């Protein structure tokens, strides 16, 4: 995945391509889910994937049977959650619709829960549940933003935000910012 992402980024940087839109799901004329490959998405997604690769490499000693604190921990579950999390982060970068971002955001929330509560200790379970609740609260911002975007433009395409009147555009962008700020609570230094 890292090689493919970097190769895609190099293709866009080297060939001067503007953007490629791929429709994945639509209802009539309404784009529900799609992907955009442009300079920004092909910069962000490879960064997410490359950092994920480094984290996986760094995690090998912790996930081995030589881990004295947790020698019996099921390692496959960690790698499934982590790989899915990285894939969802790439999906967030490539998504061309707010519905797609919502789907990938929800996937990252479930994976965060699985990774945080990985060792299944009472403290880990409590922290994992808190993370799941926080990400679902954040997702409400995307649900509301999607509704406003669709009501104002008839589409879920992120590019349609520019078609909204200035007041509605501000509301939708603030809702997206709300989602990002809620998700940052799960990062080191956050309160979660």
What are the residue ranges of the model-derived segments?
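Membrane-interfacial loop-to-helix junctions in multi-pass inner-membrane proteins
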Residues: 1, 39, 66-84, 96-102, ...
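Central hydrophobic cores of alpha-helical transmembrane segments in multi-pass inner-membrane proteins
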Residues: 1-10, 47-63, 85-86, 108-118, ...
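Transmembrane helix-loop-helix hairpins at membrane boundaries of multipass inner-membrane proteins
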Residues: 1-80, 152-163
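Juxtamembrane/interfacial segments at transmembrane-helix boundaries in multi-pass membrane proteins
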Residues: 12-34, 100, 107, 139-192
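Juxtamembrane/interface motifs at transmembrane-helix termini
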Residues: 12-15, 63-67, 113, 121-124, ...
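Catalytic P-loop NTPase motifs of RecA-like helicase/translocase cores
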Residues: 43, 110-111, 140
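MFS-fold secondary transporters
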Residues: 91-93
């Amino acid at each position: 995945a890292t090689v493919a992402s970097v190769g895609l980024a190099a293709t866009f940087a080297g060939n001067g391509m503007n953007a490629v839109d791929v429709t994945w799901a639509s209802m009539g004329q309404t784009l529900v889910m799609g992907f955009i490959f442009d300079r920004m998405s092909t910069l962000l997604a490879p960064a997410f994937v490359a950092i994920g690769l480094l984290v996986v490499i760094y995690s090998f000693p912790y996930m081995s049977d030589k881990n004295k604190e947790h020698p019996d921990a099921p390692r496959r579950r960690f790698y499934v959650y982590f790989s899915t999390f990285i894939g969802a982060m790439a999906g967030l970068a490539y998504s061309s619709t707010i519905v797609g971002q919502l789907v990938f955001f929800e996937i990252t929330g479930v994976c965060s829960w699985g990774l945080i509560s990985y060792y299944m200790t009472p403290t880990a379970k409590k922290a994992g549940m808190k993370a799941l609740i926080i990400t679902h609260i954040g997702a409400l911002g995307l649900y509301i933003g999607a509704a406003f975007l669709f009501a104002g433009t008839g589409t879920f395409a992120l590019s349609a935000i520019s078609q909204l009147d200035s007041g509605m555009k501000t509301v939708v962008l603030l809702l997206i910012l709300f989602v990002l700020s809620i998700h940052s609570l799960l990062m080191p230094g956050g309160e979660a």
